[in-house]
Amino acid sequence: NQTKCNHGNLYQVYHHFNLNTANNALAEKIMSHYIHYMHGINPNALTYLTKMSALGADRSVNTIYHGWFTEGSALWDDVRTSTYGPAPGFIPGGPNPNWSLDGCCPSSCGSAVNNNLCNITNPPSNQPALKSYKEWNTGWPQNSWEVTENSIYSQSAYLFLLSSIVNQSASIIPIANQIE
């Protein structure tokens, strides 16, 4: 997701600095395509932000990898099954066609219990590049962080891209605090 947002940001900078004003409309259109990608117009039909259903997303990210949100946590693991799930607005790493199990798999992870975790999961494996995504929060040796871990790099790239369409003249409507 960071790569997608950074590509959109290239067009934002191109437009912002008027590098070729004849192409500004095209740059705006391309930026909006990248924003739409993050908001669900992508091969997975998934809004790549956590817990966005209450804000109108048809299908948003329900779980991400994070050391604090341990798999099966009754409080934080998954929006659908935990008390809270991850907070709204986290962005997972995104599709990763290079995801793989740890090198200790299938039989050198230190114990039979660990070796039993060495299951190839499909997806993300054996999928086209942009479909190589799965929502899960399993640590070593499945290494779900390669797909679902959030990072400041992805968050900031998305926010920079999103800032390209923010209407600076927006006003707050007193009823229901909605942006006009």
Roles of regions detected by a PLM:
Residues 1-179:
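Aromatic (Trp/Tyr) and acidic
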